[in-house]
């Protein structure tokens, strides 16, 4: 096949709607195309570090069965994007809710079921820590990036609970705004309000610290830096 493939693992339909076309446009001149696979394995309460690679491999094999003209040699990288959901905060910052709802704040979480949410956080933290320290998963080069606390929080500064319809509307807003000018989206990823500076590992150590995974942060710009697609290069075109 003419173009190499980056398999793009996202958590939901809104992520796909908002990002897939824009990312494809940004790498259009690099003989790369994105294939989007939907999976939310890091948030699966039954998932463990032991089985995470096996689960990702199943997602990839399912894709390859549906796309017989794509071979292992055509896939240059797996890229996973997750929402942090405040999962990396210390257990002491999870409080028992008094109104029987789970609510997220910049400094803590008030949980409907405190112990269950702490277990979820520990599980997700262990899985993500394992993943960002790996260079390969299922035999392919692998990278993982985050929106904190989630995509709507980063791209729209909307930290409140949103309905699925509201999330979809916001995703289409992003697609409409940046599809024809993807370099502006890349510029936005460096916004001082949420951009995390540093190396790939630096950005992960930062978000794992304290209450950062509750706050508005994003390291997706590093993905484009790894591909040598950056603001300097884009601005000289």
Model-assigned labels for residue ranges:
Residues 2-3, 17-46, 57-237:
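C-terminal accessory helical subdomains adjacent to catalytic cores in phosphodiester-
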Residues 7-19:
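Catalytic nucleophile-elbow at a beta strand-turn-alpha helix junction centered on a G-D-S/GDSL motif
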């Amino acid at each position: 096949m003419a173009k190499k493939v980056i398999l793009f693992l996202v958590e939901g339909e809104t992520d796909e709607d908002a990002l897939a076309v824009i990312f494809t446009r940004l790498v259009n001149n690099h003989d790369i195309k994105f294939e989007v696979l939907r999976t939310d394995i890091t948030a699966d309460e039954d998932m463990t570090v032991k089985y995470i690679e096996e689960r990702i491999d199943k997602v990839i094999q399912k894709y390859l069965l549906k796309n017989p003209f794509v071979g292992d040699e055509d896939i240059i990288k797996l890229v996973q994007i997750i929402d942090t959901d405040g999962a990396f905060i210390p257990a002491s910052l999870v409080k028992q809710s008094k109104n029987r709802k789970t609510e997220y704040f910049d400094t803590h979480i008030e949980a409907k079921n405190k112990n269950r949410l702490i277990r979820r956080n520990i599980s997700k933290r262990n899985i993500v820590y394992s993943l960002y320290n790996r260079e390969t998963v299922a035999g392919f080069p692998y990278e993982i990036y985050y929106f904190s606390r989630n995509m709507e929080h980063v791209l729209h500064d909307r930290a409140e609970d949103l309905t699925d319809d509201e999330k979809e509307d916001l995703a289409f807003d992003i697609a409409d705004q940046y599809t024809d000018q993807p370099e502006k989206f890349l510029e936005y990823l460096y916004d001082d309000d949420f951009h995390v500076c540093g190396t790939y590992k630096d950005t992960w150590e930062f978000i794992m610290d304290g209450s950062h995974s509750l706050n508005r942060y994003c390291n997706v710009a590093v993905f484009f830096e790894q591909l040598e697609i950056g603001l300097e290069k884009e601005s000289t075109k």
